[in-house]
């Protein structure tokens, strides 16, 4: 069933606990310093209320308590909208390249949970999603955020995700929106790990496999969560359309 986690995952887990402790100390201080800010938000991940922090060239992007960004807040809101406690308790989850805030959420509220990654050791199993080592109809929910832009044969990976889903199951497959049209590279660009720069047309690859694809837009949610990506300068990509405004979209694919 793929390579199981080594003991290195324990040490990584201890490091994360220390990291979360320090973040918990940071939030009250940041909130005090910026107490006069007119920009105050709610974080659906950790429950924090107050001003958000800047993240690189993104304004008011980061929660100072849990450290999560726009797409994490968006994911939590959409997941909670779809899965109430009763439905979650009957849902088997496969989490690929797991985010720690979602790992905790899934483990606490869902029927069963398996985390996976190609290289990381702090997961239950290591495997390549182009060949998922589970039988057909194994899961009700697959979550893989910002993964497919790294996968050489992404169409095969999408088929594998659909294969291990049960009928009616959902796959959450967000990718970065860098252009209107996806750019696939023949080789990985120098100094980059990605094999493609995904665009809004990328969701057509999901529609070719799944019966239904619902795209959640951050503008449909209350502004108090600050889900839109607000940039301070232009995005540098390999596309001529370098000033393309990045939408924080979340596609949910139904088998």
Region spans (language model):
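S-adenosyl-L-methionine-dependent methyltransferase catalytic module, highlighting the catalytic core
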Residues: 30, 34-37, 41, 152-162, ...
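A short His-aromatic
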Residues: 146-150
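Generic "edge-of-domain/loop-turn" microfeature
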Residues: 120-123, 139, 180
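Conserved N-terminal segment of class I S-adenosyl-L-methionine
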Residues: 2-133, 244-252
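Conserved hydrophobic/aromatic "anchor" residues
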Residues: 134, 139, 210-211
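A conserved beta-strand element that flanks and buttresses the S-adenosyl-L-methionine
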Residues: 143
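Activation segment
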Residues: 122, 133-136, 151-155
């Amino acid at each position: 069933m793929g390579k199981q986690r080594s003991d290195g995952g324990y040490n990584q887990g201890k490091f994360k606990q220390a990291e979360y402790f320090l973040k918990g100390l940071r939030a009250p201080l940041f909130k005090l310093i910026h107490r006069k800010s007119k920009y105050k938000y709610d974080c659906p991940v950790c429950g924090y209320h107050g001003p958000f922090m800047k993240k690189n060239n993104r304004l008011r992007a980061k929660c100072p308590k849990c450290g999560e960004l726009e797409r994490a807040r968006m994911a939590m809101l959409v997941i909670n909208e779809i899965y109430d406690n009763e439905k979650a308790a009957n849902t088997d989850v496969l989490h690929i390249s797991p985010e720690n805030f979602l790992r905790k959420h899934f483990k606490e509220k869902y029927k069963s949970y398996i985390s996976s990654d190609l290289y990381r050791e702090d997961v239950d199993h290591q495997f390549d999603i182009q060949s998922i080592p589970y039988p057909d109809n194994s899961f009700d929910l697959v979550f893989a955020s910002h993964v497919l832009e790294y996968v050489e044969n992404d169409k095969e990976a999408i088929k594998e995700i659909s294969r291990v889903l049960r009928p009616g199951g959902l796959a959450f497959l967000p990718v970065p929106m860098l252009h209107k049209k996806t750019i696939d590279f023949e080789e990985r660009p120098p100094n980059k790990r990605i094999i493609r720069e995904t665009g809004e047309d990328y969701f057509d690859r999901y529609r070719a496999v799944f019966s239904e694809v619902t795209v959640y837009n951050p503008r449909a949610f209350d502004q108090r969560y600050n889900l839109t990506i607000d940039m301070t300068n232009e995005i540098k990509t390999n596309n001529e359309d370098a000033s393309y405004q990045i939408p924080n979209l979340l596609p949910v694919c139904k088998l």
